[in-house]
Each structure stands twice: as structure tokens, then as C-alpha cells.
Amino acid sequence: MPLLNPAASRVIDPVLSSVAQGYKHPGMVASALFPQVNVPLRGGKIITFGKEDFMLYNAGRAPGENTKRVSFGYSAGDYALSDYSLEGTVPIENLQEGLNGPGIDHAALAINRVQAIMALRLEKQAADIACAAGSYASANKTTLTSTAQWSDYTGVSQPTRVIETAKEAVRAATGKVPNTIVMGAKVFSALKNHPVIIDRIKYTGRDVVTVELLAALFDVQRVLVGGAIYSNDAGTAFTDVWGKFVVVAYTELGSVADMGAPSYGYTYNLNGYPLVEEPYYDRNAKSWIYPVTRAEAPVLASASAGYLITTAVA
């Protein structure tokens, strides 16, 4: 009997895989800093960008002279996708009860719950990358302390000035004006009541500070609040994924075909993933099992396209 290769031995359910691939968790913000780029291989080179767009080239050409050439984008470092697999379980009791109740799609429910768990893992992984101060040059990061923190309302802290400093640092390093701000939930809570912010919006006719108002105030396309939390193994303590950090960045959707554009980061995702294998019945557990697999890796493509604010609040 011939040996089966991995592609032949795994039976994929295309309908359930489409459910997994279409899943979007409303509370996760990692994709704003690390937009997904589908790749055909599990490993390759991270596409990085240099200063070619900003150089003054002598494009003049004398008769018979060779035309000058310009290359854009280059490989710097390697990426390797990691596989993550979990199985969603649907006891037959749930299916039996569902037959006599409302039309609940238990398969989709199980897959989406698994996807939510995996999305939280990716969110934490991306946040750890984005909030690692060691990845940034000294001009692209700051740590706020004492009365400079945005939770201090004594008149010293100036969040708008800090954001402007961050935006200028990114523009000076990349030529791109930041379009995205991601902040932890505690930071957003402090900004909603900050006197400087309240004073700036008092003429807008709005009484409540929203992310849309902050985006307009900071002059960026979008402000996103990372509200995700994770628990310890015992489930007795919970921690904010994005903590007290703020990341100001330029991000852009791209593809491998056009090599994207100078951007803060990407999430490399294997073509066709996430996928759901054909469900099977576990007699011992008396349950239907739905295996879900993802192959992905968030990478920081250009730290100079970002600015990290640490301990923005106390």
C-alpha cells in the first residue's frame, strides 16, 4: 500500500474551512498593526524596506549610456510559520437538544469558539512583539512617568503633544505619516476623561470621547482599543493583553505579489488556512470532533514605522 503524503492523508472540509477563514473577532486589534499576508510556503524571507523611495536619484542619461536601475524591498531575516491546532467538541446531547430547539449550527459554533481561542493567542503574540521596547530605536520610543502619564490630570501631561512627537519620529524615519494608533483599554479609559482631550472636543457637540473623535484629534485614520484579556492557568487572575502601552504606526495592506509597501508589520498566513479537517465521531466522548488548524506568524517588518509609548498611564 503506497504511503500517503500529508496533503493526501488529510481530508479537508471546504465548507467548514470557509467558516474558519471568514472568522473575525470583534475585540482583537492585532490585524491593524500586523495585517494578514497569505504566503505559499511555511518559511521564507521577511520583506523589509530601505530608503530607496526617498533618495534623490540622478536619472539623467547620456546617449548610449546604460539606464540606471532602482530596486525596492529586500529580504532581511527569515520567517517560519508555526502550526496551531485545536479540536472543537460537540456532545451528541447538544445536537439532540438542538433538534427540538432553535436552528443552532453547532458545527459553526464549535469552530468559532476554537477560532476565538486561537485569535487570543495571536493577539497576545502580536502585542508582545509590538510592545517590546528593545525592538525600537531610541528616537522611536518613550516611557511616561509620574505627572507625564495620561492618568494624571494636574495639567502636566499632554497626550496630544506625545502623539505628535511619535508621528514626527515615524515620518522622519520612513517618510510615511502614521495612520494607526493602538492603545490598551486602560489608556483609552484615561484619555476619555483627560482635561486636554475634553477641552479639544468641547466644540464638536459631542459629550463622550470615542475612538473616532480621538482619530480626528490625533489626525490618523484609525484609533483602536485593545480590550482583550487573558487569564493565568488557574483562571483566577486576568491581565490586559495590551497593558498600558500605545503603539503609533504606519501600516498598509500588502501582498507578496507586489511586495506590499513599507509597513510596520505583517502576519504571514499559509495559503488556504485556517482549515478544518473532516469532523469525526469520538465514541468514548460521545461527541463530534472538529479539528481546526492555523499556520501563521506575526513579524515586525519595520520597527522604524512605529513608535512605542510605555506606561502611558499609571
Q: What are these regions, as identified by a protein language model?
A:
Residues 2-61, 75-82, 145-154, 198-314:
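Sequence/fold signature of self-assembling virion shell proteins
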Residues 65-70:
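Hydrophobic, aromatic-lined core segments that form the binding pocket/scaffold
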Residues 74-99:
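Short acidic, glycine/tyrosine-flanked loop/strand segments centered on an H-E-D-like triad
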Residues 85-87, 178, 287:
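Broad gene-expression machinery/nucleic-acid interaction feature
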Residues 92-177, 185-199, 313-314:
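Alpha-helical scaffold segments that mediate packing/assembly in large oligomeric complexes
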Residues 177-180, 244-246:
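Short, surface-exposed beta-edge/turn micro-motifs
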Residues 180-184, 224-225:
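A structural signal for short, well-ordered beta-strand segments and their strand-loop junctions
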